[in-house]
């Protein structure tokens, strides 16, 4: 009788197990309901409660269910993996199980990447999905992190081969199963730990690619100073590893973009800057500083960026060979693996197992003998292109960061610019046919093509390098620098100090400097080319800052002005981005330069051409206002000069005559103020506000400011909306004070580009915002009382 309670307890326990089993099989002991287990596992994955792992089922149960659901035996394999991967395991059997799991997932991943849906449709549920649902991802994370656990003072170890298998399986699961990458990204300790796996060459490629994918979806940017022994880790990378590492760095040193257009407004940016000042440096800034503190880091990047590729393979065979391999180029890791097969024959059996095609021919992939025979110079060139675009991106971001001057000095010292000049024709802007390779799933004009991306990244780097920095003259060679000096001497003006201070040992060598090479390809670029925008931006950055007559003449002598006018007028360019970049460049090229206006008038030599030009200007003032500003400033200077050459240009130039008319200036002024509002101001359109201020500052110099304000008031009334324009302008000027009085760089740029002291800018704004309604130069004097709305709060918290 004493045993009865125990028996009853045992029966109750057995009943609970049966009930649980019945629930798992669909709530009763009969035939299982399809999908019910997977649903419960999915709920458990989301909540952390209930069914979450294969170990919660018996092997018999899983085997029976597998017959119906076709799970490829993955849950049973996971059950064995749990049993053989405990802390005291020797991991021998564990590794053999991983070898069984890997091909089940890798074939699926290959089908996913190559968009071969036929393979995945054969199973009810993808293998990667089943693997994750039964707890495979979490288990592999635990296995990989075993070395962080100590038992009796000794840290556990797992082999590189086993780590490699785990990483490949994780990567394939991330590729095929939605949400896995994000879950891994939330495990910050795991993400940091992954960096330590890059110390081994055997696991480097798999680790780097997995980290890259994880960081791409991580909500908060990782801090590199939390990576153990970062300096030692990076310093020990060989050049190939460092180039791969740049793919990761691209994510860690760039400020995160919210993707919300509203966040790009200057109001939001100013609010964010105030917040950042209280919080200290951003994670991206901390990461940049961490990298720059690593000895030799920038020097090694410069060497990578300028490393040459053997030219033993001709262009035609290069393209033909690449077309046979295009499906592999979607994934940089696959490309690295192929390179490894080609270059390290002795290691071909250890090629990364992200996809089985890199394994044996029996698995339906490339036989090693075929890979070694067919992986030619073409793949090496593409490999180098993909490396260089990542390296150039990192250098570009560092050039725009807080340590800009430090990076500039190092880039100059390590001869990045002359090195890129030597690569320009053979790699960066090499000739290729219309059948050039594009990535799988893209077209020839897609900016994702490695060739195209490299060109754009190269142009962005030149833009960042030249922008408002004296080192821009390193883009020239010695002969071209001498030409600048000769231009100054002939014009009887002082030679540019930065030219005199340029270290001639660091400039470009050869017959042409990098700037001249860029001009040559720019003039040959097809009308519809997307490169036109970036080329114009790069050349314009060379002219930015204090206006240099010698710099302008250097470019004018090479036919740049005629090329720009051809694109604007004769080709009737339709792209707004390209038009804006060409108008900006034209403005910098012509500003204060009498010779440029003479050339302009010679090219635009008919009323018909001039009307086409005006139509392009007036079609979008956001795009053309910088040119309007430069012409207005030039007109003001020319009118105050006593020179026959200047007088001749003033009397003959259609453009100067057009801008000199007060109705023209008022039309521009009215539209410039009307197309912007405080809430919509961005870095792109704030120039409209500054151009309107330039027009009014020049009017103030001539004591005509009240006249211009009175004319604006009349134009308001003619539109039947009294007060709407001047109220808006008042708010814009209030914002201007908040924005520019706290940004030294912006104020310096305004001063240098206009040759008007910033104190005069500030005075003019203060006069316009004067609250005294009796002041003839105050905006409020021209807003009637019933329509006044000047105290609106436009700040964003």
Swiss-Prot record:
Phosphorylated by GSK3B; phosphorylation is required for ubiquitination. Ubiquitinated by a SCF (SKP1-CUL1-F-box protein) E3 ubiquitin-protein ligase containing SKP2, leading to its degradation. Phosphorylation by GSK3B is required for ubiquitination. Its main location: cytoplasm. Widely expressed, with high levels in heart, liver and testis. One of its GO terms (biological process) is ubiquitin-dependent protein catabolic process via the C-end degron rule pathway. Keywords: Acetylation, Cytoplasm, Phosphoprotein, Ubl conjugation, Ubl conjugation pathway. It comes from the Eukaryota. Pathway: Protein modification; protein ubiquitination. GO terms for molecular function: phosphatase binding; ubiquitin-like ligase-substrate adaptor activity. The modification N-acetylalanine is found at residue 2. InterPro entries: ARM-type_fold, TRPC4AP. One of its GO terms (cellular component) is Cul4-RING E3 ubiquitin ligase complex. Residues 2-400 are annotated as: Interaction with TNFRSF1A. It is found in: Cytoplasm, Perinuclear region. Pfam families: DUF3689. Substrate-recognition component of a DCX (DDB1-CUL4-X-box) E3 ubiquitin-protein ligase complex required for cell cycle control. The DCX(TRPC4AP) complex specifically mediates the polyubiquitination and subsequent degradation of MYC as part of the DesCEND (destruction via C-end degrons) pathway. The DesCEND (destruction via C-end degrons) pathway recognizes a C-degron located at the extreme C terminus of target proteins, leading to their ubiquitination and degradation. Component of the DCX(TRPC4AP) E3 ubiquitin ligase complex, at least composed of CUL4A, DDB1, TRPC4AP/TRUSS and RBX1. Interacts with MYC. Constitutively associated with TNFRSF1A. Directly interacts with TRADD, TRAF2, CHUK, IKBKB and IKBKG. Interacts with TRPC1, TRPC4 and TRPC5. This is Short transient receptor potential channel 4-associated protein. It comes from Mus musculus. The lineage of its organism: Eukaryota, Metazoa, Chordata, Craniata, Vertebrata.
